[in-house]
């Protein structure tokens, strides 16, 4: 009787430890997958936005007034977005709304981030956005994004406009 009791107790301890390790590994796997999703989506987002901003044109066409100034390259909107004329001569805007990064282009609005991700911060900084400053336009943008597993990433990049900023 004592031997059976000891055997059951040892089996219970080993089973409990094994189950704990298994649950811990599942939790780590879920966190790892959430981090990978966060990195993948953030990488895509940075590449997409960088390309669009790099290919922007000066707002100097008759009849197309995307920006409030004359011959301006970019414009910061309400501290949480950037607006410009893209290479297809459409007004394009990236902005933060309800923890989601959105894009407005050609009259339509689309989400750039998926629902499980929350954009906590989106800041932009402009250098050389006007024609008269003799600087090639540069945009720095900063993103802080959090996944549903509470993994956060902070990332910043600076892009210069592809087209030379010369007077015409």
Regions found by a protein language model. Give the residues of each.
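Type IV pilin-like appendage domain
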Residues: 62-131
């Amino acid at each position: 009787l004592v031997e059976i009791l000891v055997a059951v107790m040892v089996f219970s301890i080993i089973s409990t430890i094994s189950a704990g390790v298994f649950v811990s590994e599942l939790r780590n796997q879920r966190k790892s997958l959430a981090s990978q999703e966060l990195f993948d989506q953030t990488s895509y987002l940075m590449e997409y936005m960088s390309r669009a901003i790099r290919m922007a044109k000066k707002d100097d066409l008759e009849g197309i007034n995307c920006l409030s100034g004359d011959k301006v390259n970019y414009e910061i909107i309400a501290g949480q977005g950037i607006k410009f004329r893209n290479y297809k001569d459409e007004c394009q805007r990236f902005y933060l709304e309800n923890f989601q990064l959105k894009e407005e282009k050609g009259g339509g609005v689309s989400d750039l981030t998926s629902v499980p991700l929350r954009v906590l911060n989106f800041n932009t900084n402009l250098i050389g956005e006007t024609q008269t400053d003799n600087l090639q336009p540069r945009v720095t943008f900063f993103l802080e994004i959090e996944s549903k597993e509470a993994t956060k990433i902070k990332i910043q990049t600076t892009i210069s406009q592809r087209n030379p900023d010369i007077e015409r």
